[in-house]
Amino acid sequence: MITSPVVIKNFITPEDAQTLIDEINRPSETNPYPEYYKTRYGGTAYPYNKTVLAIQRKYSLLSNDTHQRLNPEETKQIKTFKSFGSVWLEGSAANPHIDDQSPEEFIEYSTVIYLDDTFTGGDLYFPDLGFTYKPEKYDGIFFISDGDLWRHGISKIESGKRTTLLYMHTTQTEHPEGYTIVDPDLN
């Protein structure tokens, strides 16, 4: 298993990153989200449409494979639980937190993909690992989400707007309350 976050340069193509940003700002179409989205914690900046889903699926599969390769001791198949877009505006920040929290305790791995560089600040930091990452456009960062050691936060956005594509991954297939764990659109 990895012992610190792993950064992969140019994980997303410039064209795909720009398409996602364009879809946030001017959706090509909007459709209702599937029923299982109601059990998801949080929201997304992305509209639900075929353009966004095609890109999300492409990088979901790449992210699943990347986590599997980075964590060869993982014997179960890593799949995407959810994908979402986030837009952080000037003044935004996030205190250290873990991704595997109620009601989504089954999240085991996370991926953050940076779509732009039109901001200052917004570093991703892991206080218990002594690791800080200054985001760069098109990079993907991969880390384990399971447990307090992997607590992470985002420093204050000093200027501009920070746009990301995020994935939460799991090896689990069933939820005790019957929720859809593995996103059928993305795996």
Region spans (language model):
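Residue-level preference for beta-strand/loop junctions
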Residues: 4, 77, 105-107, 161
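Conserved hydrophobic/aromatic beta-strand scaffold that supports enzyme active sites
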Residues: 5-7, 85, 112-114, 140-142, ...
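A short glycine-rich, His/Asp/Glu-containing loop-to-beta-strand
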Residues: 6, 77-92
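Short beta-strand segments enriched in hydrophobic/aromatic residues
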Residues: 12, 24, 115, 145, ...
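Short, conserved beta-strand element in jelly-roll/cupin
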Residues: 87-89, 102-120, 168-169
